[in-house]
């Protein structure tokens, strides 16, 4: 087994879009005539040793024979000497039909694989999402919440941290209580409503009458008893008043009985 290919195994397991290759000995003499020989170096991880180019190269034939062969091959696609060279990997089915597989470009002697359209879209979307996430994280760091005012923006976070550090060493002044706002009252009402729905108040239970009678009869009886007691109290009070207040007749009789005998009328 070729030991040179063993060293390329870890590189082939990686994403080919992440790697590059160059040979410093070829860079000063690189030109359109030898660019395919440069790309066919054994140390190049992008070159397939089973391609038709390798077969033609081993037979020392011209690359024009590739049009009459079928299989994987490499062809020079674009040349902009001395900086840019583009090489295409394709699968040839017939002399007039070939399917592109990958494109490689050589810039200043360094070989890269050109990304496909799906990789470009994925990279752009990932970059966009990353920057959006960073922007949202930055914006959320300036968001503030107050129970009576709700959410607000505070872009003086550094000043606030500095002032907070200074105030920790000083005695805190008493904070004046502020009246509740409409936002705070609405939030409190909503929280109380949620608590009542989760934990409803128990219904009042009816007490049983121990005598088994009608509650209305019991109430009437108590009223009658109270009325009788009130009447008896009134009667006693009237009798007392009658006893305490003497009548005129009694006063006259008492006056006649008390007259001395010498002053009684003689018949």
Swiss-Prot record:
GO biological process: regulation of transcription by RNA polymerase II
This protein's name: Mediator of RNA polymerase II transcription subunit 6
Family: Belongs to the Mediator complex subunit 6 family.
Role, per record: Component of the Mediator complex, a coactivator involved in the regulated transcription of nearly all RNA polymerase II-dependent genes. Mediator functions as a bridge to convey information from gene-specific regulatory proteins to the basal RNA polymerase II transcription machinery. Mediator is recruited to promoters by direct interactions with regulatory proteins and serves as a scaffold for the assembly of a functional preinitiation complex with RNA polymerase II and the general transcription factors.
UniProt keyword list: Activator, Nucleus, Transcription, Transcription regulation
Record carries keyword Transcription regulation: yes
Species of provenance: Anopheles gambiae
Gene3D superfamilies in alphabetical order: Mediator complex, subunit Med6
Any Pfam family hit: Med6
Record-level GO cellular component terms: core mediator complex; mediator complex
